[in-house]
Amino acid sequence: MINLYEMTKNKEYLSYPERNLHMMELYFEPDGTIFTQNSTRQDRGKKVWPDLYFHQYLYMATRGNVTGEHRDEFLRAAHQIIRSCIARGDDAPDCLYLLMLYEQMAECTLEGSGFIKKYRKLFSDSGVLRVARENYAYTALKGKTAFLYVNVNGMDVCFKIGESFCEVRNFVAQQLIQTEDGCELTASANVWYYEPWEEKPNTSDWWQMDQKKRSLKIPRTLTTKVTIHEHEDGLEITLHTEGLEKLPLRLQLCVPAGTVLRNDAFWLKTEAGQGMIVRRGDVELALGEKILSFGPCFGEHEFQGHYSGEETNAGGYTIFCNALTPVDKTVFLRVKRK
């Protein structure tokens, strides 16, 4: 769009990058990286810095006729990107030719720096809620097995819920509703069985039978609701289910490998691909200078899923809180030091 503007001088084209660049800041994490877990591209889940956006922010602030709040916002963002490159010891973005072409960009003096610190934005079409507060940022996602991500100054953790019945393996939110101080995520899934054939099939090979011709018996429906409330020091997460009894559920907190877990009973440095059921109390999570606390934990069963299609946390460590439905549990994830 910037190139189209340069060719036509039609200012309407600049409204698109202005909106897009502002939106991008709502995807920046507290450590300055970009949240990519909902990406549909090859960068999904990777740690990506916004270096390639430097010249776009600088261009829009100096040549794009952006005025007022967005102009200052874009200048601060451009400066923050360069400062971050210097702090990390990385190369500056490859845009010298643009500075040579556009005098305003080359002569611009960058003073203030930083991205938007606090925001709350529901991207309803994408099923994404992004919230940044003083001590942490979090992302709630519809349609993903990892439905909640929390970032504390670069320390990323996420939540999943294991539900192993019929074709269901995980809680996947079908509805995401923003509330005054958080959000609600809800999903329903049927327990079902095949009815007997009304007409004898043409084969005795199960895999060759047209199962779509069989009726289903649906005796129960499991409804799972996750309610998230924000606090200054972290999140309050309530898990509530109804409609099915004695189903083993697993609330899973996935943390980076190398995180130290500790409480009054144990001290453990985590390894990738491993996990633990914590049956009671709170547990501290320490990674570098950052410390979080999680709990109260619970462990009513040891079933961790043994069916095909079960996801594994091969790159991190998993804390399991296990309960039998119906479930009505509340846990807290708190920032103790960031």
Predicted regions and their residues:
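Beta-strand-rich recognition/accessory modules
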Residues: 286-338
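Extended polysaccharide-engagement surfaces of secreted carbohydrate-active enzymes
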Residues: 12-288, 301
